Amino acid sequence: MKTIRRLLALLLLAGAAQANDLRLTIIDLDADDLACGLRYTAIAGKVRDSMAIMKAREFEQSDHEMLVAIATVRRPADCASDVIVTVRKAVTLAGNEKFRTRDNRAYLELCRHGGIVVSPIKDHERDFLKQVERSVQVCFGQLTF
């Protein structure tokens, strides 16, 4: 049931993001998912592609670069999850610039490799995913912060 809810949330987010001409995919995996999500057949291809892109090239900080960020988010019980964030384009940010969601539940920041990390991801509720999507739009200048 939890997996089904995750997939539905991803589908809802994908639909909303396409409507705004922004593709945003968030795949959050439990720490014990050593296969990086490959056991979920619905997203296995996306995970493989994202990992291949991430390993194949170093990203330049460019306004028109597709970025795939893989980050580990530490959680209270020393639990970590792999987070894969794919965006269509990204803006160039200084290393210390951050964009917080309006409720401060998450923030976006530029990684060393030029990717965007979303942290922390505490749940998979639709409201949370919408907040992340809005933050990415703010980052791209599509919304005023």
Could you describe each region identified by the protein language model?
Residues 25-30, 69-71, 84-88, 111, ...:
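A structural detector for beta-sheet-dominated domains
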Residues 90-94, 107:
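Contiguous, structured surface segment used for ligand recognition
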Residues 2-4, 10, 17-50, 138-145:
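A structural "domain/chain start" motif
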Residues 34-45, 82-88, 99-104:
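Surface-exposed flexible segments
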Residues 52-53, 57-89:
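A short, hydrophobic beta-strand-centered structural micro-motif
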Residues 45-59, 112-117, 121-122:
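Generic detector of solvent-exposed, compositionally biased contiguous segments
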Residues 29-32, 75, 107, 135:
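Secretory pathway export signals and precursors
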Residues 99-145:
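C-terminal/domain-edge helix-coil "capping" segments
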